[in-house]
């Protein structure tokens, strides 16, 4: 018998709003509240909000916290010197495969926060504890299931958050992208997101999230589900763990070489040896379909250099054409013509640099 689905503190709000609920990594989550297309456009044109409380905030503290994180992840947290600053990184296994992709916040040398994906949370915690024990780091790893998280995204997102919580504006208005600030006791506002739009991700006590959700609703922020979240992140050129990368995929094969910091030779992060010895046979590219049809994950891609495969694909509501990500042979370049097999027919597609959409506007691809 399968385990019952986990529920976030906003589960009753979703049901009351008529959400279609689905199993997402063992969590009962909203797919859409009505029109997925309208939810997508709300984020691109105004403001939408997502329940992301299924994701896990993990506090990492102790005398060795910085050294531990420099060992644990491929990006170098030492570059974070200002409290509240954050970076994106992959956590690798010894073979260089991606265990998870994370956002890491710096507060003090002995005080950090790591945000991990819902479906990998238990695996991630176990791996963090294993690395800490193996190298004897003096760290405390504390999963924070007492916290909830709401992402408010779109060109009007910040203004609507401030309308709902005027007291938060002074601390959060100066934030640069990938920065966070405490706006009240126990509540963190970060200028981050997964949509390609401006906005905030708000981390707060679980018992306070329902009132925040209702107050944002009163300001005209539209609830959005996983369906719109997926089309938005695809347009924005953002990977989804478990679909675009996993433990068998190196960062270079997922378009994430920019998250691997190799400059400090003395920093031997987990997976570094494999990364340095690995000759990358595959590249990660964007594709834009040139005829009617919709690209989906696992469809074959035919290139002049050989065969590849789609990892993600959808119909782009902003562009009105199908877009996707593909792992293809090295040598495939933006501007190249390739073909995607859709229902037994080879359909032409254009290789593109990512993203497809930036701040609500189409990115030009020749």
From Swiss-Prot:
InterPro entries on file: GCS_T, GCS_T_bac, GCST_C, GCV_T_N, GcvT/YgfZ/DmdA, GcvT/YgfZ_C, TrmE/GcvT_dom1
Organism: Bordetella parapertussis (strain 12822 / ATCC BAA-587 / NCTC 13253)
Self-association state and partner proteins as the record states: The glycine cleavage system is composed of four proteins: P, T, L and H.
Signal peptide positions on this chain: none
Name this polypeptide is given: Aminomethyltransferase
EC code: 2.1.2.10
GO BP annotations listed: glycine decarboxylation via glycine cleavage system
PANTHER family: AMINOMETHYLTRANSFERASE, AMINOMETHYLTRANSFERASE, MITOCHONDRIAL
């Amino acid at each position: 018998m399968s385990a019952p689905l986990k529920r976030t503190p906003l589960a009753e709000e979703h049901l009351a709003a008529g959400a279609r609920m689905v199993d997402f990594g063992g969590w009962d989550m909203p797919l859409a509240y009505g029109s997925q297309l309208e939810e997508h456009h709300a984020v691109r044109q105004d403001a939408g909000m997502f329940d992301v409380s299924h994701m896990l905030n993990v506090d990492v503290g102790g005398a060795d916290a910085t050294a531990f994180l420099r060992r644990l992840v491929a990006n170098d947290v030492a570059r974070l010197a200002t409290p509240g600053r954050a970076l994106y990184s992959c956590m690798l296994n010894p073979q260089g495969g991606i265990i998870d992709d994370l956002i890491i916040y710096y507060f003090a040398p002995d005080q950090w926060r790591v945000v991990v994906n819902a479906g990998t949370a238990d695996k991630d915690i176990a791996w963090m504890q294993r690395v800490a024990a193996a190298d004897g780091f003096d760290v405390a790893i504390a999963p924070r299931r007492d916290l909830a998280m709401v992402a408010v995204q779109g060109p009007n997102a910040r203004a609507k958050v401030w309308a709902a919580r005027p007291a938060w504006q002074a601390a959060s208005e100066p934030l640069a992208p990938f920065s966070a600030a405490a706006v009240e006791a126990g509540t963190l506002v970060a200028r981050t997101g997964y949509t390609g739009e401006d906005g905030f991700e708000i981390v707060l006590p679980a018992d306070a999230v329902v009132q925040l959700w209702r107050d944002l609703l009163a300001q005209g922020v539209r609830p959005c589900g996983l369906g719109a979240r997926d089309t938005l992140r695809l347009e924005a050129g953002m990977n989804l763990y478990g679909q675009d990368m996993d433990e068998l995929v190196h960062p270079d094969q997922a378009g994430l070489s920019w998250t691997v910091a190799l400059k400090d030779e003395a920093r031997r992060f987990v997976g570094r040896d494999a990364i340095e010895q690995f000759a990358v046979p595959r590249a990660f590219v964007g594709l834009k379909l040139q005829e009617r049809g919709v690209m989906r994950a696992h469809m074959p891609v035919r290139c002049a250099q050989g065969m590849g495969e789609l990892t993600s694909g959808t119909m782009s509501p902003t562009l009105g054409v199908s877009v996707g990500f593909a792992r293809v042979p090295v040598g495939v370049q933006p501007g190249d013509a390739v073909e995607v097999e859709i229902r037994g027919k080879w359909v032409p597609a254009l290789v593109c640099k990512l993203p497809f959409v930036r701040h609500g506007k189409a990115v030009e691809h020749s």
